[in-house]
Swiss-Prot record:
It comes from Salmonella typhimurium (strain LT2 / SGSC1412 / ATCC 700720). One of its GO terms (molecular function) is methyltransferase activity. The gene is fliB. Belongs to the FliB family. Post-translationally modifies flagellin by methylation of epsilon amino group of surface-exposed lysine residues. This is Lysine-N-methylase. Keywords: Methyltransferase, Transferase. GO terms for biological process: methylation. Its EC number is 2.1.1.-. The keyword Methyltransferase applies. The keyword Iron does not apply.
């Protein structure tokens, strides 16, 4: 028998689907794939409704056993035909949860499997997940348990060096106090130092531990926050990000989350272009000031909401250990996403005169629904971010100033 370590953040442990109460349920507006067993089960079901819907709405593709068919939706934003008038799944109500396809039974859950370890997570494309991340100060607290199974998982070993690097990065963000930007600045410095090593071995980890300790002290004493404040801002980097992002999302076909995200993008563009004779760069500065004032009045939640978002990114991506991805490039993507989400939030705050965390939840989940629902969508999105980067990873510092 073999011991397997299962690690997961608190938001995973505490998650439960909100069902019919969900603000934007996952049974609409995107591709629902069905495996071969599920297709056959529905087509041969003794339940007339299940069988008839299958005959009318399952497109047989037979690409492979896990992608044997797809649900045909009535429109780009239409509901799955198995969704009933109570916004609940007819399959689950009639045949039970075990009759659900892998797609439907697994979302929003994700499992990152290694030889003797499993890391559990959830997708931010689910609004309930996003709400927990933003509203629970302990959402990213990690817990471990050991399970016993007959054999090790058929997956590569999770190297101890990679695990420690990931923990260093998580810890830097977790000690951000009230400045997530300063913590990200510390992370940039840490990654730049780590890239000096051709190989991360025990000797390199010893040096990196000293660098981590020094950066942590500078974070806690406010040295890094002051250093970041002293960097001359370049708002053109942020306006370029806004224009590139809105171009990208407008180019996508309609799907789940598109109407919600477009509402906030339009709000941002409206605020940035409202006054003649005022540059977009100046308006970016103005709305960021509006957000800062509102967050100052909401001291408690501001200390964890955006921090938790970055912790999630580091955990979910196993940063800085993504295969075949330069760590600084990966960090640029995290910072660019964070900066755009903050700007969308700032525009909403500027128009409302106050921060509504429901707005932030809407922004974050719809952003991820549109940009990272699956690996193919995420790759396309990350390729687009390259046009903002313009070959300079360190320009991300200006997204933090």
């Amino acid at each position: 028998m073999k011991e397997i370590t299962v690690t997961e953040p608190a938001f995973v442990t505490r998650f439960s689907c909100s069902g019919s109460a969900c603000r934007d349920h996952c049974c609409k507006g995107w591709k629902i794939t069905l495996d071969k067993t599920t297709v056959k089960k529905y087509l041969a079901s003794k339940d007339t409704t299940i069988r008839t819907i299958a005959q009318d709405h399952i497109i047989l593709l037979k690409k492979n056993n896990s992608h044997w068919g797809e649900i045909k939706l009535p429109s780009a934003l239409g509901n799955c035909p198995y969704l009933d008038e109570d916004r609940l799944c007819r399959v689950q109500k009639t045949l039970g949860a075990k009759a659900l396809s892998h797609t439907c039974s697994s979302f929003p859950r994700a499992h990152h499997t290694y030889k003797n370890e499993v890391r559990n997570s959830l997708s931010l494309a689910c609004p309930e997940v996003t709400s927990r991340i933003l509203n629970d100060p302990d959402a990213m607290a990690l817990s471990e348990k050991t399970i016993i199974q007959q054999t090790f998982n058929t997956a590569p070993l999770f190297p101890a060096q990679q695990k420690l690097l990931n923990l260093f990065c998580l810890s830097l963000i977790n000690h951000a106090n009230s400045s997530t930007e300063a913590a990200l600045y510390a992370l940039i410095k840490f990654v730049m130092y780590a890239q000096k090593f051709a190989k991360i071995d025990d000797a390199a980890l010893g040096e990196l531990e000293q660098v981590y300790a020094a950066l942590l002290e500078q974070l806690q004493t406010g040295v890094l926050a002051q250093e970041l404040m002293n960097i001359a801002p370049d708002s053109k980097v942020k306006t370029s990000l806004v224009l590139q992002m809105q171009d990208y999302f407008r180019s996508l076909p309609l799907n789940r989350g598109s109407v919600i995200l477009d509402h906030y993008i339009q709000c941002l563009l409206r605020v940035l272009t409202a006054e003649e004779g005022v540059s977009m760069e100046q308006k970016v500065s103005d709305i960021e000031s509006s957000l800062a004032r509102c967050l100052q009045a909401n001291e408690q939640q501001k200390n964890w909401a955006f921090r938790n978002l970055i912790l999630y990114k580091i955990w979910e991506n196993n940063f800085p250990n993504q295969p075949n991805v330069d760590p600084l490039r990966a960090l640029y993507i995290i910072v660019a996403e964070y900066a755009f989400i903050k700007l969308l939030t700032a525009a909403s705050v500027h128009e409302r005169g106050r921060i509504e965390w429901d707005d932030v939840t809407n922004i974050v989940y719809s952003f991820h629904s549109r940009s990272q629902h699956n690996s193919e969508v995420a790759k396309n999105f990350h390729r687009h971010i390259e046009t903002v980067r313009t070959g300079d990873d360190l320009s991300m510092i200006h997204l933090l100033t």
